Curated annotation (Swiss-Prot):
E3 ubiquitin-protein ligase that plays a role in different processes including cell differentiation, receptor recycling or regulation of inflammation. Mediates the ubiquitination of AKT1 and GLUL, thereby playing a role in neuron cells differentiation. Plays a role in the establishment and maintenance of neuronal transmission and plasticity. Regulates Schwann cells differentiation by mediating ubiquitination of GLUL. Coiled coil: none annotated. This is E3 ubiquitin-protein ligase ZNRF1. The RING-type zinc finger domain is required for E3 ligase activity. Keywords: Cytoplasmic vesicle, Endosome, Lipoprotein, Lysosome, Membrane, Metal-binding, Myristate, Phosphoprotein, Synapse, Transferase, Ubl conjugation, Ubl conjugation pathway, Zinc, Zinc-finger. One of its GO terms (biological process) is positive regulation of autophagosome-lysosome fusion. It comes from Bos taurus (Bovine).
Length: 227
């Protein structure tokens, strides 16, 4: 009896779909890119992280190079998985790319929200959930000035900043309360008889220490920011 021939097995690294082959080299003349390369340029070819994200969205990784920027909805799981898997009925590596990416292994396959695909060269992430994207984009349509708290259009932001920063700080008169005067809206404590207060030109009154701290950041009355 001769020695049993061993079947050459594909080495598997700690992460599915990532090659640990020493022969993995970047393409000649190409810029370094996150992903893995295999000499010979066979079926495995270049698979970048963005391709994995495309697979997670239910699209064929083999056509990822032609996927444009846009909005996509992940295909439903279940019976359709076999149809979505690239090279259905083929090698285990194809199945790994259809089901072994982090998107589906962590339960992301059940996420029904659409995805905003940012392209293969996107920084930080290849796709953003649509329930996050609107909030990110809406923050660029307007601006809340940290000095006067007014909402300013994006195209007027620079001019508004110049006006706010060059605007002189309000002056006030020191005074001592002769009777209780309600609540100081800065510290939310009562203005009591005998407290040293600051009286602004708009006749609003605050604790002197409170308004001094307020004017270190702001240049307007807390209750009349438009003045």
């Amino acid at each position: 009896m001769g020695g049993k021939q061993s079947t050459a097995a594909r080495s598997r690294g700690p992460f599915p779909g990532v090659s640990t082959d020493d022969s993995a080299v970047p393409p000649p003349g190409g810029a370094p890119h996150f992903g893995h390369y295999r000499a010979g340029g066979g079926a495995m070819g270049l698979r970048s992280r963005s391709v994995s994200s495309v697979a997670g969205m239910g699209m064929d990784p083999s056509s990822a190079g032609g996927v444009s920027f846009g909005l996509y909805t992940p295909a439903s799981r279940g019976a359709g998985d076999a149809e979505r898997a690239p090279g259905s009925g083929g090698s285990a590596s194809d199945s790994t790319y259809a089901h072994g990416n982090g998107y589906q292994e962590t339960g992301g396959g059940h996420h029904r929200d659409g995805m905003l695909y940012l392209g293969s060269r996107a920084s930080l992430a290849d796709a953003l959930p649509l329930h996050i994207a609107p909030r990110w984009f809406s923050s660029h349509s307007g601006f809340k000035c940290p000095i006067c708290s007014k909402s300013v259009a994006s195209d007027e932001m620079e001019m508004h900043f110049i006006m706010c920063l060059s605007k002189p700080r309000l002056s006030y008169n020191d005074d001592v309360l002769t009777k209780d005067a309600g609540e100081c809206v800065i510290c939310l404590e009562e203005l009591l008889q005998g407290d040293t207060i600051a009286r602004l030109p708009c006749l609003c009154i605050y604790h002197k220490s409170c308004i001094d701290s307020w004017f270190e950041v702001n240049r307007s009355c807390p209750e009349h920011p438009a003045d």
